[in-house]
From Swiss-Prot:
Enzyme Commission number(s): 1.4.3.5
Keywords: Flavoprotein, FMN, Oxidoreductase, Pyridoxine biosynthesis
Binding site for substrate: 8-11, 66, 123, 127, 131, 191-193
Family (UniProt): Belongs to the pyridoxamine 5'-phosphate oxidase family.
Annotated PROSITE patterns: PYRIDOX_OXIDASE
Name listed for the protein in its UniProt record: Pyridoxine/pyridoxamine 5'-phosphate oxidase
A Pfam family reported for this protein in Swiss-Prot or TrEMBL: PNPOx_N
Function: Catalyzes the oxidation of either pyridoxine 5'-phosphate (PNP) or pyridoxamine 5'-phosphate (PMP) into pyridoxal 5'-phosphate (PLP).
Keyword Oxidoreductase part of the UniProt annotation: yes
Subunit structure: Homodimer.
Cofactor(s) for this UniProt protein: FMN
Species whose genome carries this gene: Shewanella sp. (strain W3-18-1)
Length: 212
């Protein structure tokens, strides 16, 4: 077994205090997202999306956050993908934003709700044309005999859609994750990290500090 126990670091970028917290967690998330973008982090919108299958086996993958507001967090995917199939059976999911250079992370527990075709189309039309074509090509999570099969289909579809707009595939969609709780983690000195969790109580958010 490879021993990694000597890899460690100190966290000294500053703490997080109760007095600094807004009542709405999405306000704090918006601030932290802005700061992550201003710091020019690599893929600041990247988040880990966790789902479970019908046997309770968890799966995780990195997906890009495309929109957020007070209602929740939006991402898009192939509706035939493993994540979409698992959401159809159990829409409870978790999201995780790992902003390591800022010594921060955000964890979200919530329920995924399918977006309307109108909402999906509105976003789909903003994608680069090659990305739109790629959505038609990949049967996400299915097995491939070789990469050449995927590339061949891409160029076939690229020729097919050479003129005009690329239509929205019926098997491509998106989700709004409505948060039930949002935890903010800020690294602290001596491993005394600051953790605050917002838990939804009807129309209000309850704020609690958690032990590190």
């Amino acid at each position: 077994m490879t021993d990694l126990s000597d890899i460690r670091r100190e966290y000294a970028k500053g703490g997080l205090r109760r007095a600094d917290l807004p009542q709405n967690p999405m306000d704090l998330f918006a601030l932290w997202m802005t700061q992550a973008r201003d710091a020019e982090l690599s893929d600041p919108t990247a988040m880990c999306v966790a789902t479970v299958d019908e046997q309770g086996q968890p799966f995780q993958r990195i997906v890009l956050l495309k929109r957020f507001d007070d209602t929740g967090f939006v991402f898009f995917t192939n509706l035939g993908s493993r994540k979409a199939q698992q959401i159809a059976a159990n829409n409870k999911v978790s999201l995780h934003f790992p902003w390591h250079p800022l010594e921060r992370q955000v964890s979200v527990l919530g329920e995924a709700q399918a977006l309307s075709t109108t909402e999906v189309l509105k976003y789909f039309m903003t994608r680069p044309k090659d990305s739109q074509i790629a959505a038609w090509v990949s049967q996400q999570s299915s097995k491939l005999s070789a990469r050449q099969v995927l590339e061949g289909k891409f160029f076939e579809m690229k020729a097919k859609f050479a003129k005009g707009d690329v239509p929205l595939p019926s098997f491509w969609g998106g989700y709004l994750v409505r948060p039930k709780s949002i935890e903010f983690w800020q690294g602290g000195e001596h491993r005394l990290h600051d953790r605050f969790i917002y838990t939804r109580d009807n129309t209000q958010w309850i704020i609690d500090r958690l032990a590190p």
